[in-house]
Amino acid sequence: MDNGTLPVQGSLDRMAALAQYLHDTDLAYYDKIYVSLDWHPINHCSFAEQGGPWPSHCVGYTTDALVTDSVLDELKRWMQAGKVEFIRKGEHVDFDEYSALDNEAVAAHLAYELRQADRLDVCGVVGTVCVQNTLKGLIEKAIDADKITVLTAYTAQFDADAEKEFVKWCADNVIALA
């Protein structure tokens, strides 16, 4: 988030907008909402202290690893309807999982469920890292790109250059932006 250990400019505003979207959206619109969470051990291999590329971030059980309060408040209505599933990624100390589909414990089941969907709306933080890798994972798991839409108003990037890179990647892979 903006003020986290791996700050992403504008992410709090994007998550506030996502919370409003969830508030305004009828429960019947989505069959299921999957929320992936970076959930790293304190000595994760991706951290600079361990020789990785990133500062320490999203350490499990810290506020860095959680969804924002505003999004969680709006998810509660969906959770009461049995429509939310949380997926942790990056829990293993020795390798990273940038995609929600990299978590081998849930990947096959998740891919199966997502293949059954008529449409998939995807959003999150950080677009060029976790969101883009999740999109790649969807395509690798034989999920049709034509039913995927990235909700850009709720997708935060590191900076304007990353935003351009992400938009180009989506266009190159025939993934719709809304």
Identify the residue ranges that each predicted region occupies.
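Glycine-rich phosphate- or other oxyanion-binding loops that anchor nucleotides, phosphorylated ligands
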Residues: V84-R115, R119
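Short Gly/Thr/Asp-enriched flexible loops that form oxyanion-binding sites at enzyme active sites
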Residues: V131-K141
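Short catalytic/ligand-binding loop motif for oxyanion handling, primarily in non-cytosolic enzymes
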Residues: P41-C45, D94-D96, V129-V131
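Histidine- and/or cysteine-centered catalytic micro-motif in compact active-site loops
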Residues: D38-W39, K89-H92, V125
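Short, small-residue-enriched loops and turns at beta-alpha junctions
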Residues: D94-F95, T155-D159
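Glycine-rich anion-binding loop/nest that anchors nucleotide
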Residues: D118-N133, T149-A156
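Active-site acidic carboxylates
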Residues: M1-I87, Y112, Q116, A142-V150, ...
